[in-house]
Amino acid sequence: LLDSLGGRAAVAAAIHARLLALRGALEASEFFATHEVVGSSLLFVYDEDDGGPPPSCWMIDFAKTMQVDAAAVPPPGLTHRAKWELGNHEDGYLSGLDSLIDVWGALKLQLEMESK
């Protein structure tokens, strides 16, 4: 991953910021709170040209997203972070996103340190 960034701390910083914004939006989303998201993907996009569009990340592939009946989910409801157990509809989406945020944050810091 470091090699593909070509030492560009700004790219890592932009992706990291986008992932943080995505997590914030998902945590505030009524739709996300009531849907199990299985098999979706994150599409990372950036142009190697410095004059291209800013680096970003997008959620894609929602074919297996299903609304969950609130009565079928024990309190505190669907968290997207709780461990999956048969019938709890937890998908681990936010756990995975948290891990990606940690990875991109570490990449950003490493590239910033290397550029000094």
Q: Where do the model's predicted regions map?
A:
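Polybasic, positively charged surfaces/segments
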Residues: L1-K116
